[in-house]
Amino acid sequence: MISKTVVEALEHFLPAENIYINEPMSKHTTFRIGGEADCFLQIENMEQLKKIQRYLQQLEIPYFVLGNGSNLLVGDQGYRGVIIEIADKMNEVRVMGSLIVAQAGAPMSKIARVACENALKGFEFAAGIPGTIGGGVVMNAGAYGGELKQVVTMVKVVDREGNVLELDNATMEFGYRTSAIKRLPFTVAEVHIQLAAGVREEIKARMEELAARRREKQPLEYPSAGSTFKRPQGYFAGELIMKAGLQGYQIGGAQVSEKHCGFVINKDNATAGDVKELISYVQSTVKSQFGVELEPEVIMI
């Protein structure tokens, strides 16, 4: 529970209309699942982010920084602390020659559109990834042979004390669905993306081709957090799950997608408990049949 004193203090940092108490997180995740957060803030700029993180850190109040809620499962009990949401208002994208500078809340789809409009190639792979660039760099998001580590040159982050740091590509230590930020207490504020000059029509055609492949193979018609499991070395998670006979397997309202077994979907008003139980069952079944450990890609809070 967040006290009235804390809420009043937060009103010094951002407008009162950007502060929500007991906010249902099901409204803010692509899974459409999640209980209430004690306090939900919509951040507009880096200065607000710096001041609020510093304040919450001083009071030792737990907080979680949220993009657009993809790749995330919030528990049925909600979140005891403060959710800092950046996607709604902190999402500016600027073009400086062949360099794109994006605020952390900018959707990767928006960055891809801006790149295409400016005839910049190299970001087409990310056009359909359902997340913000801030969350994307933390996970080193990728698809169709591309990864953010290939185009990100610098990441501006805010530490818990409100200091701004600049991390270059090497310092980010990008790996498969990971980066240095996953283990460091930093919040992504801004990302620099270096692209190359291209032909607008060719870039658009490539984006449309990848979008068609997504629509054909992924269950975009249902709420989900995107791909549920990381790819185990030497295997494909969806293929193992299908071979284990789990295609369409359902617990409560959560289901292993019939369209793509690598996705757990919210088929019918699923709870977080349903999803967690289904993920656990899939993991144990695949482990017992094939000896392969499936690691969830979805973040759970």
Where do the PLM segments sit?
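Structural signature of FAD isoalloxazine-binding scaffolds in flavoprotein oxidoreductases
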Residues: G34-G35, L41-M46, L73-N91, V138-D168, ...
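Short, basic and Ser/Thr-rich N-terminal targeting/leader segments
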Residues: L59, L66-N68, V151, Y222-P223, ...
